[in-house]
């Protein structure tokens, strides 16, 4: 029997506000344990939550970016459960009226076609703290993350393969990153993924029993975990077994999933409206204000780069991988840079430099202005393409004017025949054996003179002009 794979994803995105969702504590990552906490985070008796408006702003932006409807009257709910990293014994979340609902995004499939993936809801909530189990027999609780704002984005079960799930996550991460509401760094926990997967016989309308996957710390592991579950569940069903509704974690070392617990249903959390927070009215003016702050998104930029700038689909995809790179490219083109040349540099020397240095483009001194200037002085013959690599490294490390650096460092290409011809004559005088080989008709003897000339000029001879003048002077030797 063959089975159809059904996948839905729950993605938690940490919002990059300065303070937490309901307390004034810093929400920044990487501080000492419990440094970013106060009495609200500790859940002292009598303390009350205070809503961070910036979190609602971010939620509206996310909902708009994901083509969602927005609840004009929004409230929060209590999700009740006990765990050491949750000192209140409940989480403030949203249940029946999330900030966004009924959305969708398009994903690009391997065959080049697109597929629409529906998004059921996006709700705001507070994050829990972090438990660390020490080797000394104690468990430690760090509440820095407690109360950090999250938006949970829940897809419909529209994905039919691990590859589609990977494509959905890639597209979703791009969109969220472009809004500026999160850096979506999985390695820092600002983007976390839970996957729900079930199988059903082809032709059956009813979904099978789902399994939830956790501990998916990379898109690659999401795909691997789902691939393992497809095989595990299919094998179990074919042998007459029954799939339980359970939570499993992906074990990277063993390349498989391991049972964590039998899955609880929503009723186990006993949701009820949060009594300490009011109803929030989101009017059209607020929505329009947030919409005006949104950028053009990757799909629209890719189409523009292909249709208006003549770039390939591959180049357009690479240039829109991050908003900062895309903005850099667009600024360079707006300053008069040739789109293809700017693209080549960004994907070539710039990308190699960033990888080697472990930096992003905003962390180096290169600017759109000095990159465009460098490309211009390559085009007008001031420097060669080979010399430009040295110029680029200087600009990346120090910034400044490309032309000023070239002139100060003595890197200007020699293109004047009045300068080059005497040097060519000196090359002939210094290499009599090569001249003799050339005059005797020895095969490829003329090729050596190019190297001699470039060495004599320390690589500064204009290659095109040098080749033309060499040919002329060598012809005179024959005559």
Curated annotation (Swiss-Prot):
The cross-references to InterPro entries, in alphabetical order and at most eight, read: Asn/Gln-tRNA_amidoTrfase_suB/E, Asn/Gln-tRNA_Trfase_suB/E_cat, Asn/Gln_amidotransferase, Asn/Gln_tRNA_amidoTrase-B-like, GatB, GatB_C_1, GatB_Yqey_C_2, Gln-tRNA_amidoTrfase_suB_CS
List GO molecular-function terms, semicolon-separated.
Answer: asparaginyl-tRNA synthase (glutamine-hydrolyzing) activity; ATP binding; glutaminyl-tRNA synthase (glutamine-hydrolyzing) activity
Q: Which UniProt keywords apply?
A: ATP-binding, Ligase, Nucleotide-binding, Protein biosynthesis
Q: Which Pfam families match?
A: GatB_N, GatB_Yqey
Q: Its gene?
A: gatB
| Role according to the record | Allows the formation of correctly charged Asn-tRNA(Asn) or Gln-tRNA(Gln) through the transamidation of misacylated Asp-tRNA(Asn) or Glu-tRNA(Gln) in organisms which lack either or both of asparaginyl-tRNA or glutaminyl-tRNA synthetases. The reaction takes place in the presence of glutamine and ATP through an activated phospho-Asp-tRNA(Asn) or phospho-Glu-tRNA(Gln).
Family as reported in the entry's similarity comment:
Belongs to the GatB/GatE family. GatB subfamily.
Kindly state the subunit structure of this protein: Heterotrimer of A, B and C subunits.
Supply the enzyme class, top level. ligase
Q: Which GO terms describe its biological process?
A: glutaminyl-tRNAGln biosynthesis via transamidation; translation
Question: Catalysed reaction(s)?
Answer: L-glutamyl-tRNA(Gln) + L-glutamine + ATP + H2O = L-glutaminyl-tRNA(Gln) + L-glutamate + ADP + phosphate + H(+); L-aspartyl-tRNA(Asn) + L-glutamine + ATP + H2O = L-asparaginyl-tRNA(Asn) + L-glutamate + ADP + phosphate + 2 H(+)
Q: What is the name listed in the Swiss-Prot or TrEMBL entry for this protein?
A: Aspartyl/glutamyl-tRNA(Asn/Gln) amidotransferase subunit B
ATP-binding is among the record's keywords? yes
Organism, by scientific name, is Streptococcus pyogenes serotype M1
Known EC number? 6.3.5.-
């Amino acid at each position: 029997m063959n089975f159809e794979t059904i996948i839905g994803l729950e993605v938690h995105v940490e919002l990059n506000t300065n303070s937490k969702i309901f307390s004034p504590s810093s929400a920044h990552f990487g501080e000492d344990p419990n440094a970013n906490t106060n009495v609200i985070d500790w859940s002292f008796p009598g303390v009350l939550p205070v809503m961070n408006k910036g979190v609602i702003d971010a939620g509206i932006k996310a909902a708009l970016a994901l083509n969602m409807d927005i609840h004009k009257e929004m409230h929060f709910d209590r999700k009740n459960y006990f765990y050491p990293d949750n000192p209140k014994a409940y989480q403030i979340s949203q249940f029946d009226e999330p900030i966004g609902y009924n959305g969708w995004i398009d994903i690009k499939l391997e065959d080049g076609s697109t597929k629409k993936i529906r998004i059921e809801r996006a709700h705001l909530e507070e994050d829990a703290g972090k438990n660390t189990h020490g080797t000394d027999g104690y468990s430690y609780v760090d509440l820095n993350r407690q109360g950090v704002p999250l938006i949970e984005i829940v897809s419909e079960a529209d994905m039919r393969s691990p590859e589609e799930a990977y494509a959905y996550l890639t597209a979703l991460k791009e969109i969220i990153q472009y809004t500026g509401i999160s850096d979506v760094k999985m390695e820092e926990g600002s983007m976390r993924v839970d996957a729900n997967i079930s199988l059903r016989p082809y032709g059956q309308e009813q979904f099978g029993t789902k399994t939830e996957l956790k501990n998916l710390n990379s898109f690659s592991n999401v795909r691997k975990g789902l691939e393992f579950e497809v095989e595990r569940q299919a094998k179990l069903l074919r042998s007459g077994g029954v799939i339980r509704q359970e939570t499993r974690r992906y074990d990277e070392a063993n390349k498989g999933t391991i049972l964590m617990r039998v899955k609880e249903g929503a009723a186990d959390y006993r949701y009820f409206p949060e009594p300490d927070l009011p109803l929030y009215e989101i009017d059209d003016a607020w929505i329009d204000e947030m919409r005006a702050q949104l950028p053009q998104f990757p799909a629209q930029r890719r189409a523009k780069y292909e249709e208006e700038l003549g770039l390939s689909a591959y180049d357009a995809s690479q240039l829109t991988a991050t908003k900062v790179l895309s903005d850099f490219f667009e600024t360079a083109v707006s300053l008069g840079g040739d789109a293809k040349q700017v693209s080549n540099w960004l994907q070539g020397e710039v990308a190699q430099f960033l990888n080697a240095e472990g930096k992003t483009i905003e962390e180096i001194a290169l600017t759109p202005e000095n990159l465009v200037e460098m490309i211009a002085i390559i085009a007008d013959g001031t420097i060669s393409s080979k010399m430009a690599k040295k110029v680029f490294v200087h600009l990346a490390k120090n910034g400044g004017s490309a032309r000023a650096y070239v002139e100060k460092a003595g890197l200007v290409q020699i293109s004047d025949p009045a300068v080059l011809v005497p040097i060519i004559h000196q090359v002939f005088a210094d290499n009599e054996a090569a001249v003799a080989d050339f005059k005797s008709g020895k095969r490829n003897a003329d090729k050596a003179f190019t190297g001699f000339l470039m060495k004599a000029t320390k690589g500064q001879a204009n290659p095109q002009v040098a080749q033309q003048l060499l040919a002329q002077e060598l012809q005179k030797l024959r005559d």
